[in-house]
Regions:
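Terminal accessory regions of large proteins
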Residues: 2-244
Length: 244
């Protein structure tokens, strides 16, 4: 169409990450060409190299609260595709293309937390196939699911296995930080106070979110893929990231 846009290295890496997320959910498989699953009958035989997430719920956290969170799964994907020997080198390459400060895993975590979803919305013209459940700006709780694998019990499972679990992690972490305050030097206390304030904000945000999830989980909402993304997304608008 006469566009002079040249794809950047970041564009290429964003595409790779999108494909990796597709493999995590079973939309794509490294073992078959094209779409592996977009509704209908699930065929586990299509997945040998990367096994899709069983729950169709992948947490997106600002810290390593879950070993199977999206960063852990992405690292595993890079390892399976490109080999363990060059893993750190490849993660650094991904992080450098994305841009940002910190270790490669920190940069990748920051991307998933802040930019992945807006990139996904752009790619799919605001009709996302991966849905981001989000408690709000404090990042108290975030998790992705794949629309085509949605089941009516998804929210109930998310609430029990992930939201409650995250709340428990916050309680434990806060206790550890508050205990550390007792023996901390004045300079260290400033840092600890900051962390405590942040965690308290997140704990409050997730507490309110838990009530919203509970309300919807009890309804066991059905979706019809033929209705399209917009209609189905609207059913969960109170608990999903807003589409901008």
């Amino acid at each position: 169409k006469g566009s002079n846009y040249v794809r950047t290295m970041r564009d290429e890496i964003v595409s790779l990450i999108s494909y990796a997320v597709g493999c995590m959910f079973g939309r794509y498989s490294l073992d078959v060409d094209g779409l592996a699953y977009a509704g209908g009958e699930w065929d586990a035989g299509k997945y040998k190299t990367v096994i899709p997430d069983r729950e169709n719920i992948i947490p997106v956290c600002d810290d390593e609260y879950f070993s199977d969170d999206i960063v852990g799964k992405f690292v595993d994907f890079v390892c399976k595709v490109y080999g363990e020997d060059t893993l750190e080198e490849n993660l650094r390459f991904v992080a450098d293309a994305l841009g940002g400060k910190g270790t490669s895993r920190e940069v990748i975590r920051s991307y998933f937390l802040s930019d992945f979803y807006s990139d996904h919305l752009k790619t799919y013209q605001k009709r996302p196939i991966y849905w981001l459940f989000s408690s709000g700006k404090k990042n108290g709780f975030k998790a992705l699911c794949y629309m085509h694998r949605y089941q009516p019990d998804l929210l109930a499972r998310m609430r029990t296995d992930y939201v409650h679990e995250q709340q428990e992690r916050y309680r434990t972490q806060l206790q550890i930080l508050e205990d550390s305050m007792q023996s901390a030097a004045p300079s260290e206390r400033v840092r600890l106070n900051k962390q405590i304030a942040k965690l308290k904000d997140q704990a409050l945000e997730i507490q309110k979110y838990e009530e919203k999830i509970h309300h919807l989980a009890d309804q066991m909402i059905e979706i019809d893929l033929d209705d399209g993304v917009k209609v189905n997304y609207a059913k969960f608008q109170d608990v999903l990231e807003k589409i901008k």
